[in-house]
Amino acid sequence: MHLSFGTNKPMNIFKGWENHTERISANWKRLVKPDDTVILPGDFSWGLKLEETKKDFEFLENLPGKKILLKGNHDLWWSTSKKLREFLDNNKFNSVDFVFINCAVCEGYAVAGTRGWFFDDKPDPKILRRE
């Protein structure tokens, strides 16, 4: 989604990304019903710190359905599981959950994931150990 409501990193500098949040909202509301589950496979927010993502989560909370987020390579705000859950609870973001060292069960399926990327010519051992 690459949202940036809480930070100054607009996506409209890239061709094809003009009004992307408005288009996301309109298409989401057209397609997703309140009982649906949407899996967001990373790159949710450009915020660098969890606090900078609050407006992005407000945008997401106001869309229908349950949302499950996985960590993307641009989700630098991603913190510990405890801090992420406290953030959701403290802000009453009730329709959002994380897959983080666990899985989420929805509609009879277990959803799990991890950050992935294509290897360059030489894999980076530091990233491999961390991820």
Where are these regions (language model features)?
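Core catalytic region of metal-dependent phosphoesterases/phosphodiesterases
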Residues: 5-106
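Metal-dependent nucleic-acid phosphoesterase active-site entry motif
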Residues: 1-3
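Binuclear metal-dependent hydrolase catalytic cores centered on His/Asp/Glu-rich metal-binding motifs
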Residues: 107-131
